[in-house]
Amino acid sequence: MALTSYICFNCRNSYRLKTSLRNFSTTRPYRDLLRPATAPKPTPDVKHIRQNADLYAQNCIDRNYVAHAGHPSKIQQLSEEARQLDHDLKTPRSRIKQLEKTIAKLHIATRQGTDGNTNEKDLSPSEELAELKSEAQRLKDDSQSMTERKATCTEEINRLALSLPNLSSPFTPIGHDPTLVQYLNFNAQEPPTWTRQSPTELQARSHVTIGTELKLLDFTSSATTTGWGWYFLINEGAMLEQALVQYALSTARRRGWKTVAPPSIVYSYIAEACGFQPRDAHNEQQIWSIEQNERDKNTKPQRSLTGTAEIPLAAMYAGRDMNASELPIKLVGASRCYRAEAGSRGVDTKGLYRVHEFTKVELFGWADSVDGAVPSSDDMFNELLDMQMEILTALNLPCRVLEMPSGDLGASATRKRDIEALFPSRLRAASGGAATPVDPEIHYLESAWGEVTSASICTDYQSRRLAARVRGGGAKESRFPHTVNGTAMAVPRVLAAILENGWDAERGVVVIPEVLRPWMDGMESIGRS
């Protein structure tokens, strides 16, 4: 009978894969997540953290991880304790070996009927054996206790190290205020005419109003079927979504990015390895997990809905070795994304700007981390930005590019740039207590900007947690590659921006960007039926 390559999950869970290329974790839960033997074993850079504890502590403060600021010094303490335990174990282990040899000789002497006693207490062989065995057992108990404590220290060191955010790049502004890099399709000296419209006129320019009137959006039905945070795209609205996806994919393919259709469900430990936590710093739910029955909770790893295709695209190479000749690896994938968005308030909750389920096209790349690598992760980061700016410029959306501050980087990124578009519907939320304006010259527009894309460098943060390595390429040792990721198209937000910025009130139509028309049956505008 022919054998297939299929192995059931329970067998995989009990069978350790035999490979010299990758070590996997044990089945012990890590941070309350069941991890099977096939799960990638994370490898934090404990040595670098231990040697630069002050740097990591300050980085935690800069990045809003204040509760983690004590972890680096704790890692130092635990490392010293583990080192001392390792030293202290040498004496009892050596003594145990001596005792075992002596005990063996006494056993032989006893069987041969000779007197093998060498003790000064003039004990009988049986008495000496009992005494030696007692000492050996005591030393073994002490050794076991120290060994277990050392293992506990090592486990705690890894847990603390893995909880730390990535170090921020030299380009990253420290604090909470981003830095303006440039504008796209926007002149600060001549802002759009709608910026001078009344609140009533701005309300008429909202994508909710436009989309409902032109029968592109249906929030009434979604309120019945699913609730807040969902929507129906109908008629030309549904066509616009597909046009945006195809335009983003075609742009990426033209630049040599490989198309992937990824799953939208992953193991929860995979999402965590990529830097996505179930709850944010305010304990608000961010990721939806698939409910398990009581029997499965202790036998099967939990799964989660992905908030971005970044997670499954990164996981494609989890636990694998890449040859340097394979790099760079450039992937683009369209997927449905799911976000809890707990704690959202105000204008963000209206319409398409902040929703629970949406379509997004994501870019993800791997670059060699060795010095002099071509392309480097910085090169790929710049390629991502160029692509994002090309897409948004062609869509005729007024945008600004921001270098994001340390307080907005999350856990995995060392550097992040966001691109924000102008939304007329968000301008009406302006208030005197708004955040510090990025451009004081047009401070009154600050609330109207909304993020539509993001690009990040994660250095080796994700590859260390996903156990992905690079070999070859002139370097003797394997190393952890760098990862970059970015949004090619966040459909709901870009669609909303097109409706609001492309609205022609006099004609009662939305002008369709020229680059989308091939996927819109050649339509130039969407108007009233």
Segments predicted by a language model, with ranges:
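TRNA-recognition modules of translation machinery and tRNA-sensing kinases, especially anticodon-binding
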Residues: 69-71, 81-84, 88, 186-529
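N-terminal alpha-helical targeting/anchoring segments
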Residues: 2-195
